[in-house]
Amino acid sequence: MFGVYFVLLFLSSALIHVANAGSNAEWRKRIIYQILTDRFAVDDGSTDNPCDPDANQYCGGTWKGIENKLDYIEDMGFNAIWISPIDKNIEGDIDGAGYAYHGYWNTDYESLNEHFGTEDDLVSLITAAHKAGIWVMLDSIVNSMALAPPLADADYSSLNPFNKESYFHPYCLIDWDITDNETNVMDCWQDSGVLLADLDVESSDVSSYLSDHFKSLISKYDFDGLRIDAVKMMNYTFFPDFVDATGVYSVGEVFSYDPDTMCSYMSVLPGVTNYFLQLYINFSFTATGAGFTLIPTYQEVMASNCSKYDSTLMLTFIENHDLYRFPYYTSDQSQIMGALSFVLIWDGIPSIFYGQEQGFNGGEDPANRPALWLTDYDQSNPYYTVIKTMVAFRKFVITQDPDWVTSTYQSIESAVDHYVGQKNDVLVMFNNMGVTNNLTIYEVETNYTANEVVSDVFGHRTLTVGADKTLTASMTNGYPLIMYPHSKMSGFTLPTVNRTVMPSTSATATTTVYTSYYSPSYSARSFTGTGSIFTISSSSRLILSFKTLVFGLGVTAMLFVLFF
């Protein structure tokens, strides 16, 4: 019976791609695995290709490498991947800023990045992904193009097709200390070591080309969605025509922890990256400041500030290529597993950054971008197993209850150390007490029927709801409880979470991190220190962290800087 169910589900996914590929409604059902193309897999699948993140060089990851490792992604259950930008990028080590291995320093919209492969390789990857029921989201650059410094020698003729200075806003650097001038952010240039010339998207020549170009790319390669980089640096007026032209779900990167700024772009885009929630997930699971009481606060702020927009189309995440890895903030296994589970069961479209399944713990870019192949693609890693379990459960719930993806969680109980919430038939209990502690939650009110038996997805056990519809449950060793009616799980078997406690990662004074559960060791930067857990730059764009947590007024003051 299980085999028949699986086949029907697979066929259904294939048919959906033909009929509704790229629609907002269908993207709600997707679970995204974000790939940094250069760091995921090499052509031949080898696992010993050297890669030093600190060198800021190309390490050899390709589209063919991704295709050859789709089974790794498919085994975790992901049904969408987000790949790096595909355009040709500036070559060489630019003024000490490194190479454009990440794909964000584009110079030619009409050519592919040859470091990642050929046109045939890209077509083959997308075809193979679709055959496996996996959609492909393209990271798109529409805000800027890269020039080699210095400005006095800037060669606009090196760019294609925008090969004249007149296609760009006049040079000025964004001043992040100016908080009340949108024009400064939208028209000035970013400082990234290279010159990121800011495209004049208000010009019809520029905007029309970009809309037509990405419409053509989507048609030619059969992309299913777009992630749009640096949305906050662009005028709102550009996006409606661009979104209409491309015709697929587009999620904009709004790198801001201010909910007003974040939600303002929902007026012109289907979805945005939910950095506001990302910050609160981080605080909650690291027991920082107000802890889990921030989750209902988040819900209240969203209801007040963003109620006219559809939050279920936002991207939910805890890591990406611009952020410190979450295990940099905490080495506690249950806190990390809890944060992973939260992302994969919460509202919105979940996105997992490559390497989260292996526990990557690097800090500031480039330490957060090691090569995945140096882990041997370990499928026994506990983080891999929790992702696999939660992805399978989320997909199962969606098949049982299609309205689940448009519903939102209702908070039932929260404190600094725990949170309880329910969405339809899914009840969640999270805590941040760590792997050496247990916590019992007494008589939690639920929406279940009296005396109903519920299954704990995470721990593979059952509990019984009381006659008064309340539930008393214990969270052991800091792990969460994810519950669902036992009667509705008949015939469905979830993967088992490996909860074997792994030794804490130890770091030498060099850039090599040694662990007992990665084979072989991989290179990444690791930091220790004292002080507050977060330091926010004047731009509010970069979170720096140290290992010692500070509670109370320090955190309150930081939140004041961020949001008021």
UniProtKB/Swiss-Prot annotation:
One of its GO terms (biological process) is ascospore wall biogenesis. The record marks D322 as: Transition state stabilizer. Disulfide bonds join C51-C59, C172-C188, C263-C306. Its main location: membrane. Ca(2+) 1 binds at N143, D198. The keyword Nucleotide-binding does not apply. SMART domains: Aamy. GO terms for molecular function: alpha-amylase activity; calcium ion binding. Residues 539-564 form a propeptide. N-glycosylated. It catalyses: Endohydrolysis of (1->4)-alpha-D-glucosidic linkages in polysaccharides containing three or more (1->4)-alpha-linked D-glucose units. It is a lipid-anchor; GPI-anchor. It is found in: Cell membrane. Glycans are attached at N181, N235, N282, N305, N438, N447, N498. Has a role in cell wall biosynthesis where it is involved in maintaining cell wall strength and shape. Belongs to the glycosyl hydrolase 13 family. This is Alpha-amylase 3. It comes from Schizosaccharomyces pombe (strain 972 / ATCC 24843) (Fission yeast).
